[in-house]
């Protein structure tokens, strides 16, 4: 099953997440199919906190991909901002 989820990157105490489309059997930071955006929870000031390619997310959802709980919240936030 294909899932759209967060893959943690960044340094210790400085999380940075890639939003990826991956097979649910792969590890969270392992092999992925496509990168559709990023989420920076520690963004301050003029830094971009969220970038998401909504067209690609909608494409994958139409193909049967499921969203993780946190990614579903981020998609809702991105749709409000767009």
From Swiss-Prot:
Does the keyword Ribonucleoprotein feature in the UniProt annotation? yes
Q: Record's superkingdom?
A: Bacteria
The UniProt entry, under Pfam families, shows: Ribosomal_S16
Keywords in alphabetical order, please.
Answer: Ribonucleoprotein, Ribosomal protein
**Gene Ontology biological process terms in this record:** translation
Q: Which GO terms describe its molecular function?
A: structural constituent of ribosome
InterPro entries registered for this protein in UniProt: Ribosomal_bS16 (IPR000307), Ribosomal_bS16_CS (IPR020592), Ribosomal_bS16_dom_sf (IPR023803)
A GO CC annotation recorded here is: cytoplasm
This protein's record includes keyword Ribosomal protein: yes
Record family assignment: Belongs to the bacterial ribosomal protein bS16 family.
Task: Return the protein name.
Answer: Small ribosomal subunit protein bS16
Name of encoding gene: rpsP
């Amino acid at each position: 099953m294909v899932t759209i989820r967060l893959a943690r990157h960044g340094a210790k105490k400085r999380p940075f997440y890639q939003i990826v489309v991956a097979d649910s059997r792969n590890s969270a930071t392992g092999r992925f199919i496509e990168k559709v955006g990023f989420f920076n929870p520690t963004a301050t000031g003029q830094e971009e906190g969220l970038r998401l390619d909504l067209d690609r997310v909608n494409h994958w959802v139409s193909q049967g991909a499921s969203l993780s709980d946190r990614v579903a919240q981020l998609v809702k936030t991105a749709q409000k901002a767009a």
